[in-house]
């Protein structure tokens, strides 16, 4: 609901800095405080294009608590794989009512999809690491996780324009390159 409106700037930061995030949006009648006890699909455009500028976000639409559970797990995989915010869009009835369901089953052997993560071995071998470098042409760069390597793979991320190596720049070609890469990422998301 209105909480998505209040989070727009931070959603844009997560999108542009490519920080995985999952947001569950229980929609109600809007605008403003609207009708807080009535269901409505009022946040679709707000979530799809959350923040200013050229942002797009994957949206998942569960219809019952079981799908909420399943799509919740999928949302975390997609957020990591695409390195972007993912929304799980619920209607008020689904999110706020009491439901009788079969027990949810979690498979402890299920592998998490962390996406493109560069390990210490690759860094040690001298593989070129640029936090926003699109090696595979799908718009999704490789990332490292904190503590991967004592001297390589660290990066400083920001919400401002940057080049492929996460260095601040306002040069037009670097900005255009980054925005085109982000659009390729969204095209990749359509095929997942």
Feature locations, PLM:
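Short acidic, glycine-rich surface-loop motifs adjacent to enzyme active sites
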Residues: 55
């Amino acid at each position: 609901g209105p909480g998505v409106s209040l989070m727009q700037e931070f959603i844009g930061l997560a999108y542009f800095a490519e920080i995985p995030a999952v947001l569950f949006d229980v929609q109600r009648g809007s605008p403003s405080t609207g009708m807080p006890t009535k269901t409505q699909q009022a946040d679709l455009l707000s979530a799809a294009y959350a923040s200013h500028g050229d942002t797009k976000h994957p949206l998942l639409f569960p219809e019952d608590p079981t799908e909420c559970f399943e799509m919740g797990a999928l949302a975390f995989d997609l957020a990591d794989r695409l390195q972007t915010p993912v929304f799980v869009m619920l209607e008020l009835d689904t999110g706020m009512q009491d439901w009788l369901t079969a027990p949810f089953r979690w498979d402890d052997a299920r592998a998490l999809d962390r996406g493109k993560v560069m390990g210490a071995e690759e860094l040690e071998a001298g593989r070129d690491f640029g936090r926003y470098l699109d090696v595979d042409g799908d718009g999704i760069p490789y990332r490292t996780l904190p503590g991967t390597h004592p001297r390589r793979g660290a990066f400083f991320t920001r919400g401002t324009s940057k080049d492929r190596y996460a260095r601040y720049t306002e040069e037009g070609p670097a900005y255009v390159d980054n925005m085109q890469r982000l659009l390729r990422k969204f095209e990749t998301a359509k095929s997942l």
